[in-house]
């Protein structure tokens, strides 16, 4: 059985972008007059694609369209085969994106049954359907329904069997579930919004920390879930990659240590100092700064400030960011020239719960930078 998503863009308006000779590579045909790149693009309020989900029975060579109760302007961000051949999981979103439905569709009868409805305030984050994983007759995904992003465990009929993680912190990644041991592997910001650590939760609900270094940790697990590669870094430590045992977190081998890189760069880079402060409205924000090496607190210095603060983003992290911006090279150079370089994660940035992240809803450009 095959399944796919079909997009009918025939009624979607065309958007046009001018193109010029000075593009790279050079567009010689636009030497005297600019050209245009035309494509289908639904701006806010314009007609969306008509979306449908189809299946193809390889044995009988029959194509069918699922009877999916999707709004005319709705979305289908994901489809997943399950272990049950009569259940194809189809994820839908309304255009407002504050309601996510997970349907179990029969590929042959085309009937669709609602399994889970996720309705939250303002919008469903991408992490909800992006984290969705299926294991036998169960599935799991990350939801912020509690006010923070946590992992939830369902059976294929849509019954919630367990909230895997709990607390006033966000789960950042769901790595997978070990069917044999009943362990859920994930990363979270439990220790600090600036840091991540790798954990697993066992059958009894007990939590076990696998990463040992303080900073930013990310993992890639083997298909057997017995081993994982842990990539650790901090503001002062380039990435260190180790192979670890998934049951104990014990390091089995160091694959990359970047020792020489650290020795060569440390004398050249300025020191990131993390800080927090409260705005005039009492909102606590996180930031970092790099000061001149001969900094004198009694003197005044010009300040260069980097700001992004897009929804769910993070620039203030205890992580090695060399090679990115703001990563350290330019900032350290400007500090050597007598500037203080600062960066602040404004309102609406990530790892601080749903209320903080979604406060910029319908206020983009207003609250992000204040």
Task: List the predicted regions and their residue ranges.
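Short loop/turn segments that connect beta-strands within beta-propeller blades
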Residues: 57-61, 106-110, 155-159, 202-205, ...
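Structural motif
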Residues: 11-17, 50-52, 97-103, 147-152, ...
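Serine-hydrolase catalytic core recognition
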Residues: 1, 14, 85, 217-370
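Glycine-rich, acidic and aromatic/proline-enriched surface loops and short helix-turn segments
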Residues: 52-61, 109, 306-310, 345-348
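Beta-propeller fold detector
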Residues: 64-67, 112-117, 161-166, 208-212, ...
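Conserved beta-propeller blade repeats
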Residues: 1-5, 29-33, 37-45, 50-52, ...
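Predominantly five- to eight-bladed beta-propeller fold
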Residues: 1-65, 250-262, 315-327
């Amino acid at each position: 059985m095959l399944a796919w998503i079909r997009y009918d863009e025939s009624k979607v308006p065309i958007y046009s972008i001018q193109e010029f000779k000075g593009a790279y590579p050079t567009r010689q045909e636009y030497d005297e007059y600019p050209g245009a790149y035309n494509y289908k693009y639904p701006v806010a309020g314009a007609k969306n694609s008509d979306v449908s989900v189809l299946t193809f029975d390889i044995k009988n060579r029959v194509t069918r369209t699922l009877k999916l109760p999707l709004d005319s302007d709705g979305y289908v961000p994901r489809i997943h085969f399950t272990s049950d051949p009569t259940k194809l999981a189809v994820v839908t979103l309304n255009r407002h994106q504050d309601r996510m439905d997970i349907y179990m569709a029969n590929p042959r009868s085309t009937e669709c049954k609602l399994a889970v409805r996720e309705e939250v305030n303002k919008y469903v984050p991408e992490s909800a359907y992006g984290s969705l994983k299926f294991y036998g007759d169960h599935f799991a995904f990350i939801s912020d329904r509690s006010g923070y992003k946590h992992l939830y465990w369902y059976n294929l009929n849509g019954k919630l069997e367990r909230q895997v993680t709990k607390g006033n912190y966000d789960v950042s990644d769901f790595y997978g579930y070990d069917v044999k041991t009943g362990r859920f592997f994930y990363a979270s910001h439990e220790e600090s919004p600036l840091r991540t650590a790798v954990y697993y939760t066992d059958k009894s609900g007990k939590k076990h920390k696998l990463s040992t270094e303080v900073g930013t940790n990310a993992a890639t697990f083997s298909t057997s879930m017995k081993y994982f590669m842990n990539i650790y870094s901090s503001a002062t430590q380039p990435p260190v990659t180790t192979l670890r045992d998934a049951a104990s977190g014990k390091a089995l081998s160091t694959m990359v240590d970047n020792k020489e890189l650290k020795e060569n760069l440390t004398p050249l880079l300025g020191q990131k100092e993390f800080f927090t402060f409260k705005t005039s409205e009492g909102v606590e924000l996180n930031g970092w700064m790099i000061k001149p090496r001969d900094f004198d607190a009694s003197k005044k210095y010009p300040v260069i400030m980097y700001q992004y603060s897009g929804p769910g983003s993070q620039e203030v992290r205890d992580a090695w960011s060399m090679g990115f911006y703001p990563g350290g090279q330019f900032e350290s150079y400007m500090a050597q020239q007598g500037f203080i370089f600062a960066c602040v994660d404004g309102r609406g940035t990530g790892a601080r719960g749903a209320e903080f992240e979604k406060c910029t809803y319908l206020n983009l450009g207003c609250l992000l930078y204040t």
